[in-house]
Amino acid sequence: MFERNEKTIFVLDHTRYFSISSEQYISMDYLKGKPMPAETPAAGSSVGTQLSKSLWTCAVESSIEYCRIVWDLFPGRKHVRFIVSDTAAHIVNTWSPSTQNMSHVSNAMMMVSVPSRSIPQSSDYSVIHGLRAAIEALAEPTDEQLQAAQVGCKKISNEGRVICITSARDNTSMKSLEDIFNTVLLQQNALVGPPGKKGLSIDHCHLVILNIVPLGVESLVTNRSLLEISPLLDVEIHTVHAPNISDKLLHLIMGHYDLASTTVTNIPMKEEQNANSSANYDVEILHARAAHTKVCGPDFTLTTSIKPGTSYETVTLKWCTPRGCGSSDLQPCVGQYNVTPVDVTSRPSSCLINFLLNGRSVLLEVPRKTGTKTTSHMLSARGGEIFVHSLSIARSAMDEAPSITDGPGGRVADYRIPELGQLLKMSRMVPLKAKPKGKMSQGEHLWRRLPRYFPRTMNVTILFNLQRQLSWLPHFLHLLVKEDMDKQDEVRCQQQIHELYKSASRGDMLPFTNTNNTRPKMSKTKDQYRLFYRELEQLIQLNVQTVHHKNLLESLQSLRAAYGDVTNKSEPGAAHLRSYTESPLSPERLEPNSTSSSSNSLLKASKRRMSSSGQRSLLDMISSAERSQSSKRLDFTGRLCTPIGQTAKLYPDFGNKDKDILTPGVIPSNLKDDSIRS
């Protein structure tokens, strides 16, 4: 219910060390005609008028910027508190909504001011006071948690994050800080339990320690990624130079609140010096990451890049020139999210914010080198807040779900949907009050047997295509799947099979409806009957339950043999395997022992058609490529000299001492006539 980023507490070290300079100097020489220094001069340089921020100023500015982003994107939903630590912990604000604003925090920080350098070095000045107060603040409930308790919520989750900005000497001091924080956390949870019951227990805490040092100073504290100290505490450590603390917190906040960065490019703005000309500027904004994931969908991704000087990715979108468009040109909105600029004080950001707050809207498009423009987002303001709207550039969210007929291989419109519905009704199972006897119940047996053979589309079956044209076929198929077929049913099926054989002998066509009023050739008619017999045999094989089924199967196989479509019985299980693997309309498979002239003619005809049409199989292409490559290389001499069936021996004289002592370049006469032996 309450996430970890619901509560965030900044603990700022207000000791004497934070009064020193950050060693980043800013030139104050604004006189015209004087060039700016090319490099930042060192401390004590006499070039121009310069100033430098203290470590305390860098820490306060960056932490306030952190909470500004949080309150802009999550107004009233996420809470940030500040605690200043020196000789004691000073609470800057509380969880109350009246203190969760920029004005209150800024005024309080002005009253704290920079630590004095005249403060004597003492152990009373420590950041530990602030960390203790931060743990106590995490145990205090927010207004939302109090409301959840009032409505009777038994378990209220209470997690939080503590960001401590301090400076430590080495890893040992940092380890001591972690141990003290973990100990105080356990003590605080012990206090809230019975019988004290003070506040909420802390389920988990994420401690982020930022070790701040001046520019150019090397720290003995090493960086460390997220590490689990205890089931209640995770700690990560970052050593940062004081001028870079804002960039580090900006990078951290994107992970803390699942944010994403978008850079709006090519924003036309009037120049201050020349109102008649304009230049293009870029503005970086932050928003929830879902603004990018929702707009893309599973089949589209936005291009990202790493902005110079930063370590996070940003999505680049172009400013789209406003133009008149109708409702049909607008994409549906799939989500809206609050937006805040990264650099709120820059002139381009200020111009964009004022432009939006004045009631204007901005369309953003995905930059493309070629093709049409794709508008993916829209910026607009309502009620003093700026939102980014995610526009659907994939399949519209308001469109109906994709039809079952829209397959990857093209539109398929001949699914046997009514037959599938009947199969589902026949296979429907309901729970029984008593457990049936035997290994398999009757319902489970039926459920396993019925869908063994079910063509999904009409273009892969001949048998089920003829049900409407042959009046006897539906009843015939019903008798085939009966488990209790009797002798009378067998006789009826035998009669229908013999009638079908007589029609094939006379050369009658099968009554297909899509013959386009043209009589098929005799060879095509035979192929249709042959496929019909094969599919019928496959159906009977999968439903053999009684002796009558077996007699019917043997009768059909004898008819297939008489018709020239013999099944090879020398291969065990070959017919049963084909019943599962072969499609009724698959190409004719010839058996090795078949002597049918019609089968041979079909095979020769298919070969002629393939050779005449120029079609080649994958094996032919691979073999041809291998032969062409092999012809360019000389074969191994030993293989050429070795008789067929034997293996050539590599280095036949290797290890022969008599041959090793021969003079180099002299070949004995007895070796000239010997060939390489295997």
From Swiss-Prot:
GO terms for biological process: cell division; centrosome localization; dorsal appendage formation; flagellated sperm motility; meiotic cell cycle; oocyte nucleus localization involved in oocyte dorsal/ventral axis specification; posterior mRNA localization involved in anterior/posterior axis specification; regulation of fertilization. Pfam families: Mat89Bb (PF10221). GO terms for cellular component: cytoplasm; INTAC complex; integrator complex; nucleus; perinuclear region of cytoplasm. Residues 593-604 have a biased composition (Low complexity). Residues 570-626, 652-678 are annotated as: Disordered. A motif (Nuclear localization signal (NLS)) lies at residues 603-609. Keywords: Cell cycle, Cell division, Coiled coil, Cytoplasm, Developmental protein, Differentiation, Meiosis, Mitosis, Nucleus, Phosphoprotein, Spermatogenesis. It is found in: Nucleus; Cytoplasm; Cytoplasm, Perinuclear region. Phosphorylated. Coiled coil: none annotated. Belongs to the Integrator subunit 13 family. Component of the integrator complex, a multiprotein complex that terminates RNA polymerase II (Pol II) transcription in the promoter-proximal region of genes. The integrator complex provides a quality checkpoint during transcription elongation by driving premature transcription termination of transcripts that are unfavorably configured for transcriptional elongation: the complex terminates transcription by (1) catalyzing dephosphorylation of the C-terminal domain (CTD) of Pol II subunit Polr2A/Rbp1 and Spt5, and (2) degrading the exiting nascent RNA transcript via endonuclease activity. Belongs to the multiprotein complex Integrator, at least composed of IntS1, IntS2, IntS3, IntS4, omd/IntS5, IntS6, defl/IntS7, IntS8, IntS9, IntS10, IntS11, IntS12, asun/IntS13, IntS14 and IntS15. The core complex associates with protein phosphatase 2A subunits mts/PP2A and Pp2A-29B, to form the Integrator-PP2A (INTAC) complex. This is Protein asunder. It comes from Drosophila grimshawi (Hawaiian fruit fly).
